[in-house]
Amino acid sequence: MERIERRLTVPAELAGRRLDQAAALLLPEFSRSRLKTWIDAGRLTLGGQSARARTRLAGGEELALVTELEAAIEVAPEPIPLVVVHEDSALLVIDKPVGLVVHPGAGNRSGTLQNALLHRYPELATLPRAGLVHRLDKDTSGLLLVARTLASQKTLAAALERRHIKRTYQAICQGRLTGGGSIDAPIGRHPRERTRMGVVDGGREARTRYRVLERFRAHTLCEIELETGRTHQIRVHMAHIRAPLVGDPVYGGRPRLPPRPSDELRSALQGFRRQALHAVRLGLEHPTSGEALQFTSALAPDLRALLDVLRADAKAAR
């Protein structure tokens, strides 16, 4: 555990504010929920005395924080290989392989990206979700952003909420799309199948943009940008326009084959067992320096192999 001692004087401009509100402004490196916990436990005091979170301030009081920064998560470190695209004192960019679960959960407390991060970067144990700013599904490959400090995590989470972080994907879709477009359709839990998401009335706002990169006889390679970040958003939205991702076990349906497909193409499509989706680019402003950053990731080997088969089939059919 890390010991923390901070002493601050409440500035006059915060007069009239609640203690918890002022603490969030004066100690932005800590989350509001954590500050509230410390106030309730008497670790964040006002004028040397415990106080309630709703106490109104007059200005000029002394705030004192004396506590231990306990681990935010109880996940065991594990020596799982990581591909680190970028590393500095504020953030990491990880290239996640297919099949790696991001967050521990029921049935998979080990073998996740969080376990790997905690082994290589033990200090992340003090951060919510080990610093992860967003997530990818288990069988989606590509770039993930991780904060290394609580201040960076809060800044990056706010940037994500304001849509200042640009996330770009490539996907192999079923069907032959004629052009790009934008999908604006709310996403929520499927009304009957609770493990699925769907486009539903009253769902959360969700917007996706896509453009065609390459067409094949019965499939399309698309570049996709998220404007929002709902669960399974790309998979749900592309299925909604009848262009589900190849291999998607939940939203994909049966493989679509062109007329007279080669045995190689039939085998490749029927054997592709995960959604054909890869996070290829990540663009953001550095949380401390403000520098514009952009990171790229090459398509995963299984996607490259499938594209080779699709191209060969299209060429042979000319």
Annotate each predicted stretch with a short phrase.
Residues 1-318:
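RNA pseudouridine synthases
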